From Swiss-Prot:
Function: Involved in peptide bond synthesis. Stimulates efficient translation and peptide-bond synthesis on native or reconstituted 70S ribosomes in vitro. Probably functions indirectly by altering the affinity of the ribosome for aminoacyl-tRNA, thus increasing their reactivity as acceptors for peptidyl transferase.
Organism: Pseudothermotoga lettingae (strain ATCC BAA-301 / DSM 14385 / NBRC 107922 / TMO) (Thermotoga lettingae)
The name this protein goes by in its record: Elongation factor P
Cellular component terms per the entry's GO annotation: cytoplasm
UniProt record similarity statement: Belongs to the elongation factor P family.
Pathway named in the protein's UniProt entry: Protein biosynthesis; polypeptide chain elongation
Length: 185
């Protein structure tokens, strides 16, 4: 059992005996009394999305998930192909199953496939992946005075902010949990 205040985007919980993936979660505090945890849940079975509100302090059952080491092979547009490393069996996930994880998938990336009752429902990425910068503005002398960074497009299409010294063609490390620049690779 997990407290609803600890729910995070991507977790899979059981609601009314059916597994649901947490698509969005927000906490709202009332002036007097307990807070409300508003969630957007997507049914793993049917794909329907519904809004569910929980009282602060409520507990929900976490789905019984299993994990297998796998490798990302390729994408054919709408589907993403993976291979289990232990028996070389291949699995296909849709873009909808992957959600934001699709922005970090490069060929041969090793990750964990997430299974619910022997059916793949998603992936668990490594905390940091190395991606190539394919487009960013050139740096100019004096850029660092204002601090901050500049926008960049990575090889997967992901758009993030990077420090001014990062140039097109360089490889950088990106945190898959936050989507932020970590360091040069």
């Amino acid at each position: 059992m997990v407290e609803v205040g600890d729910l995070k985007k991507g977790m899979v919980i059981m609601v009314n005996g059916e597994p649901h993936r947490v698509v969005d979660v927000s906490k709202h505090h009332m002036a007097m009394g307990r807070g409300i945890i508003r969630t957007k849940l997507k049914s793993v079975v049917t794909g329907f999305v519904k809004d569910v509100n929980f009282s602060s302090g409520e507990r929900v059952e976490e789905a019984n998930l299993s994990f297998r080491q796998a490798q990302f092979l390729y994408s054919d547009g709408a589907h993403y192909h993976f291979m289990a490393l232990d028996d070389y069996e291949q699995y296909i996930l849709s873009e909808e199953d992957l959600q934001d994880a699709k922005w970090y998938l490069i060929e041969n990336l090793e990750l964990s496939l997430v299974f619910l009752e022997d059916k793949p429902i998603g992936v668990q990425l490594p905390n940091v992946v190395t991606l190539k910068v394919v487009e960013t503005e050139p740096s100019f002398k004096g850029d660092t005075v204002s601090g901050g960074g500049k926008p960049a497009v990575l090889e997967t299409g992901l758009k993030i902010n990077v420090p001014f010294f990062v140039e097109t063609g360089e490889f950088i490390k990106v945190d898959t949990r936050t989507g932020e620049y970590v360091e040069r690779a």
